[in-house]
């Protein structure tokens, strides 16, 4: 991946607003044989070309396909690309593998969670696959998802299409391309294993499946962004855990992630994690200082971590004590997905400089906290946020390089 010696490079963390006609095709094309699905695949290359051009216009240096091929939640697309899972009847004798999302917060703010507001974006229209404000999702209790047979990746043609569309859209343009791909924890850690002899064997199989997708991306000369929010959100699923319990688990998690990354070029790998993109209090998020050293054991060249919202913006101080290894880079989020307020470019610049002064200006690139296409209320606000990030990066570059 590109390392700049004269300015701060700009990227973002994932999904971007999709054209309305593409959303309609996705919503109508759930059947594999539908006419809408065929039309969707014909429309997709032009849509990706358009969003790449839009990113370039807004000053983004490391661009993606907007995650246009990934309808709904950030990880749902893998249900079509990985087999080995099935819906099975719930077994009253089998305890839930873990608590629900944000259980620590949920216990302190039960009324807020009952409202369902945290499922929504911060306002405005909601992309297909996301709940509308105030709607409470009802989760069936009579069945559950489980691993019932060997885990295998079957998404080769789908990821090949993702790669082809992005490479065509970036050809001849002075940008790098990246594709986001789900991490093994986020794919499999919350699902019961009914097939393998142990959790370790099961999660290694999940990692093997993920690796097929990662390798396809890196073999194509693109950057793979491993999307692994569960590196930071796992704490919320186990309210009885101590920090020591979490660190023990994350030691195992690092091994799983590195198993998925084995043999792949670190210079094409960026690892992204966050504290979950739900609009919720986040008062019980695990603090970065407790796990930053474990994060750096992941075999990636770059670490993209949520850092722009009001709960975590102060955590650049962690890097006063934790030393970034030689050759590694940080990509702090300096734009928040949690608000429709557009960050001032001066604030963006200040955030960038805070990191650059601690880890070195050549070791910092800039990003959003998470994908903002689905969580910010309107696409006009998304474009304004990306423009503010680019302007802030330019201001920071002048301060850091003196020109």
Predicted regions, residues:
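Domain-level signal for soluble alpha/beta catalytic cores
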Residues: 1-403
């Amino acid at each position: 991946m590109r390392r700049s010696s004269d300015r701060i490079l700009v990227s973002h963390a994932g999904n971007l607003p999709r054209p309305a006609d593409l959303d309609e095709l996705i919503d109508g094309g759930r059947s594999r044989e539908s006419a809408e699905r065929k039309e969707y695949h014909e429309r997709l290359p032009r849509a990706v070309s358009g969003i790449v051009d839009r990113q370039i216009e807004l000053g983004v240096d490391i661009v993606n396909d907007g995650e246009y091929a990934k309808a709904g939640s950030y990880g749902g697309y893998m249900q079509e690309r990985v087999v080995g899972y099935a819906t099975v009847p719930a077994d009253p004798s089998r305890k839930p593998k873990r608590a629900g999302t944000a259980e620590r917060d949920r216990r302190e703010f039960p009324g807020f969670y009952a409202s369902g507001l945290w499922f929504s974006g911060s306002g405005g229209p909601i992309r297909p696959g996301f709940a509308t404000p105030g709607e409470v999702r009802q989760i069936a209790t009579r069945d559950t998802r489980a691993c019932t047979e060997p885990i295998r990746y079957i998404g080769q043609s789908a990821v090949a299409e993702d790669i082809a569309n992005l490479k065509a859209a970036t050809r001849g343009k002075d940008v790098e391309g990246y594709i986001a791909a789900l991490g093994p924890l986020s794919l499999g850690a919350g699902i019961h294993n009914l097939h393998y002899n142990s959790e370790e064997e099961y999660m290694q199989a999940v990692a093997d499946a993920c690796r097929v997708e990662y390798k396809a991306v890196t073999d194509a000369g693109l950057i793979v962004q491993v999307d692994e929010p569960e590196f930071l959100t796992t704490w919320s699923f186990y309210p009885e855990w101590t920090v020591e319990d979490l660190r023990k688990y994350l030691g195992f998690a690092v091994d799983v992630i590195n198993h998925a990354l084995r043999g792949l070029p670190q210079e094409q790998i960026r690892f992204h994690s966050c504290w979950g993109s739900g609009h919720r209090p986040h008062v019980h998020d695990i603090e970065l200082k407790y796990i930053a050293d474990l994060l750096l054991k992941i075999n990636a060249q770059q670490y993209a971590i949520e850092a722009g919202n009001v709960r975590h913006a102060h955590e650049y101080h962690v890097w006063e004590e934790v030393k970034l290894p030689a050759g590694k880079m940080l990509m702090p989020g300096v734009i928040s997905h949690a608000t429709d307020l557009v960050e001032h470019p001066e604030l963006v610049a200040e955030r960038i400089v805070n990191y650059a002064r601690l880890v070195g200006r050549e070791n910092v690139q800039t990003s959003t906290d998470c994908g903002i296409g689905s969580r910010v209320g309107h696409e006009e606000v998304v474009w304004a946020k990306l423009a503010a990030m680019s302007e802030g990066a330019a201001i920071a570059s002048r301060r850091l390089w003196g020109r």
